[in-house]
């Protein structure tokens, strides 16, 4: 590699999913094309120890490498890689160091860049003369003619004027010729594993009616490979204080320090919760980006959470006529959100009871009714309390000033919740049927934020943040909820009953030994939490704003977003004086709801993209138990949130960068590049579980690949020459040859066994099952004989018989025949 020093601004044009056209980079393309022919120095796969360290990156503990270094095997692998690179020149392969690493660690996967083949080998839709295959000597001349025509050089048309720079190809440019052929022309991957650089070139045509310069322009893009260091630097650039945050000892400081309480009335007992958190039981992330440790629900932590979440209720409301105001708010709710003011709901008032009865019948058929309490025998005014162990990501630079307080959950038992859930589920179904189409509540059948035919261009947004939402709800909120439920056809006795045991309640934490009385607050874990919070938010916004002109409104719990052609106006003083709520209208407001940004696609639909500042912190969670299944569960959840990440085009990415800049980075103009880097990291780590596990300090291959269980009694010692013997069992000492690797690459192994071997394999499984059954019978017979000897010794007075032995004798005598004791 030449000694040319890359310009920082030149290299940092990172992470885009399409090409950015920039004429100023043409000189760099010529320099890059000269560098392609030069070998990469420092990471040559030559079988040496230095190449092993750079390619495998082993752990060195006490002078011993993990995984161990086998010079003979490493040399054979390097030779195999070189032969494969020389043989397969017609398809793009992964870097040689990565190939050697996969072979040495027995990591399953393809050596061919299949994604790049799909992207850069367009399907021939012509008359079929692009590639010809000679079946006999008569077609030899046609093959030579086609080969000569394909090798002809095409004169490139250069730009003579200055073309204005565009940020997206979707609006103006259309690709007409995209090439991705060999490693010696368009595509170059250096063997520097930490920071390889890709070079891609594509010709595009300007589809805009430009009278001055309609010529074809060329331009490259330089993409920086995603790495943990780059991802961590991205987070530190956006949130600088997160780089110095480490709360490993915060729990110990809290428990061993003094604590002062400021409660009017609270009940305490001696708690026996152990606050120590064993770090060896959890995966440790490799990135330090502000993630908090798992919170333990000790008495001090619970008191701190109760102080912020339940105590110190604000009292900002004025004196009002409670019943008349509640009826007026409920009437405004019906006229704003429901068709024909909700008359359809009242006509079918018995649907709630009918659906609830059907649910209970279905539930009783497959559930054990033992342990289910009768609701009349349960104190419904008493709620259990617990502390959430997971702390939400912090998106502000305040980690050096205050410690985030964990959220709390107040809930009924499972039996009580199972009694009330069917009623509220049926009631919400009725609300969904009567709800106007421009109002969206993402729950049930509409469980996501992907909306069709909703435009964001030339629209105003209203994004409001309601602070202290749960504990600020008072008697007025309870009354107009009751009126709305009655209007939706909810049974009146249940409505009044539900309202009565929410007036005065008692919270009790059985582990932290803390008890506290509350009034009118939202219970964060009962059957009506999400539905009730959504109704409260909808009713307050409808009463304080005119929603008749809005194009779309989304409500989910305490989150809301209004999209309108006319700038919406919200009376914030009414929230303070009437609803006892602290509200903050974001200025400028962006399409952001439920910690997700809404971005418009080319077809006029909306897709949701998770907040990059929150998701990048979730890549370094500190509460995942050291278990492969737990880590895989977090990976599945991460993939579910990133299901639309690969559908983003350049226009959508640019729009998302502007949204993030308006919401978080008004003083950080460089946040555009960091958002692109974060999106590239999300796309990489959501591809497979192997890449996701690289974010945590794991034990290498043992985390994402488990060896197959080996039977103690093998049928035969002969090894099968199949795909699974070499690539699925990473402990196999025998390594495949070159031809086997070639077959692996081109996919000649359609299955582990051929058709002829299937009967043999079936017979082998039967033999193994018989051997296991025979071994089990032999062990049981031996145990029976041993117990018989103990019984005989006890009868003759030569030994004692314990109670455990007596039980074993009884169980074996019931299992085996008397002839088995002979």
Curated annotation (Swiss-Prot):
It catalyses: RNA(n) + a ribonucleoside 5'-triphosphate = RNA(n+1) + diphosphate. This is RNA-directed RNA polymerase 2a. GO terms for biological process: DNA-templated transcription; positive stranded viral RNA replication. InterPro entries: BBMV_Gp1_N (IPR007610), Bromoviridae_RdRp (IPR047309), DNA/RNA_pol_sf (IPR043502), DNase_TatD-rel_CS (IPR018228), RNA-dep_RNA_pol_alsuvir (IPR001788), RNA-dir_pol_PSvirus (IPR007094). Interacts with replication protein 1a. The keyword Membrane does not apply. It comes from Brome mosaic virus (BMV). Its EC number is 2.7.7.48. One of its GO terms (molecular function) is RNA binding. Keywords: Nucleotide-binding, Nucleotidyltransferase, RNA-directed RNA polymerase, Transferase, Viral RNA replication. SUPFAM superfamilies: DNA/RNA polymerases. RNA-dependent RNA polymerase which replicates the viral genome composed of 3 RNA segments, RNA1, RNA2 and RNA3.
């Amino acid at each position: 590699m030449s000694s040319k020093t890359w310009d920082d601004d030149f290299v940092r044009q990172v992470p885009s999913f399409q090409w950015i056209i920039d004429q100023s980079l043409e000189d760099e393309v010529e320099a890059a094309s000269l560098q392609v022919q030069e070998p990469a120095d420092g990471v040559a796969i030559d079988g040496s120890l230095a190449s092993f360290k750079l390619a495998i990156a082993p752990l060195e503990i006490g002078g011993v490498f993990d995984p161990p270094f086998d010079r003979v095997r490493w040399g054979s692998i390097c030779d195999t890689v070189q032969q494969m690179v020389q043989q397969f020149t017609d398809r793009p392969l992964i870097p040689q160091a990565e190939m050697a690493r996969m072979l040495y660690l027995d990591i399953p996967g393809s050596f061919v860049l299949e994604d790049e083949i799909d992207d850069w080998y367009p399907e021939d839709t012509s008359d079929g003369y692009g590639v010809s295959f000679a079946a006999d000597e008569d077609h030899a001349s046609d093959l030579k003619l086609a080969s000569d025509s394909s090798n002809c050089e095409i004169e490139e048309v250069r730009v003579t004027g200055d073309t204005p720079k565009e940020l997206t190809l979707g609006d103006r440019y259309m690709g007409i010729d995209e090439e991705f052929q060999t490693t010696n022309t368009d595509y170059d991957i250096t063997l520097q594993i930490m920071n390889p650089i890709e070079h891609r070139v594509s010709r595009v045509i300007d589809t805009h009616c430009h009278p001055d310069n309609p010529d074809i322009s060329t331009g490259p893009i330089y993409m920086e490979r995603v790495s943990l260091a780059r991802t961590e630097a991205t987070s530190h650039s956006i949130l600088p204080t997160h780089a110095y945050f480490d709360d490993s000892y915060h729990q110990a400081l809290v428990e061993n320090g003094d604590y002062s309480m400021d409660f009017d009335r609270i009940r305490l007992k001696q708690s026996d919760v152990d606050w120590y958190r064993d770090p060896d039981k959890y995966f440790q992330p490799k990135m330090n980006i502000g993630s908090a440790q798992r919170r333990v629900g000790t008495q001090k932590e619970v008191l701190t959470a109760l102080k912020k979440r339940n105590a110190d209720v604000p009292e900002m409301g004025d004196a009002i006529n409670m019943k008349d105001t509640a009826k007026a708010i409920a009437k405004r709710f019906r006229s704003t959100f429901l068709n024909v003011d909700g008359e359809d709901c009242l006509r079918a008032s018995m649907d709630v009871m009918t659906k609830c009865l059907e649910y209970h019948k279905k539930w009783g058929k497959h559930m054990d009714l033992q342990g289910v309490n009768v609701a009349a025998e349960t104190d419904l005014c008493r709620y259990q309390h617990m502390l959430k162990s997971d702390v939400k990501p912090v998106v502000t630079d305040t980690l050096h000033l205050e410690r985030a307080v964990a959220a709390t959950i107040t809930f009924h038992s499972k039996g009580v919740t199972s009694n009330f859930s069917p009623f509220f589920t049926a009631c919400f179904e009725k609300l969904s049927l009567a709800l106007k189409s421009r109002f969206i509540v993402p729950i049930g059948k509409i469980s996501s934020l992907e909306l069709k035919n909703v435009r964001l261009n030339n629209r105003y947004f209203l994004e409001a943040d309601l602070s202290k939402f749960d504990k600020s709800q008072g008697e007025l909120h309870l009354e107009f909820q009751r009126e709305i439920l009655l209007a939706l056809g909810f049974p009146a006795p249940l409505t009044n009953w539900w309202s009565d045991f929410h007036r005065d309640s008692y919270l009790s934490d059985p582990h932290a030994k803390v008890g506290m009385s509350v009034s009118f607050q939202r219970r964060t874990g009962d059957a009506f939490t999400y539905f009730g919070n959504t109704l409260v938010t909808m009713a307050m916004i409808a009463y304080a704003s005119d929603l008749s002109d809005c194009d779309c409104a989304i409500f989910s719990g305490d989150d809301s977003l209004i999209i309108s052609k006319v700038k919406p106006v919200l009376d914030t003083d009414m929230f303070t004086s009437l609803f006892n709520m602290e509200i903050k209208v974001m200025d400028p407001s962006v399409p952001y709801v439920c910690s997700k940004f809404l971005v418009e696609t080319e077809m006029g639909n909306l897709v949701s993209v998770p907040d990059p500042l929150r998701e990048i912190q979730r890549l370094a969670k500190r509460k995942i138990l050291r278990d492969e299944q737990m880590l895989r569960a977090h990976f599945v959840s991460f993939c579910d949130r990133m299901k639309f990440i690969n559908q983003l085009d350049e226009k959508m990415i640019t729009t998302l960068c502007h949204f993030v800049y308006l919401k978080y980075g008004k003083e950080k103009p460089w946040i555009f590049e960091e958002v692109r880097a974060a999106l590239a990291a999300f796309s990489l780590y959501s591809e497979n579980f192997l890449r996701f596990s690289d974010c945590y300090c794991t034990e290498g291959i043992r985390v994402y690949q488990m060896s197959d269980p080996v039977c103690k009694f093998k049928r035969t010692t002969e090894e099968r020459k199949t795909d699974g013997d070499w690539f699925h069992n990473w402990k196999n000492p025998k390594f495949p040859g070159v031809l086997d690797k070639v077959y692996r690459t081109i996919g000649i192994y359609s299955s582990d066994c051929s058709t002829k071997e299937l009967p043999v394999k079936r017979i082998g499984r039967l033999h193994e099952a018989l051997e296991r059954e025979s071994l089990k019978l032999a062990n049981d017979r031996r145990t029976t004989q041993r117990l018989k000897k103990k019984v005989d010794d006890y009868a003759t007075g030569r030994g004692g018989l314990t109670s455990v032995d007596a039980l074993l004798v009884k169980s074996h005598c019931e299992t085996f025949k008397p002839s088995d004791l002979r």
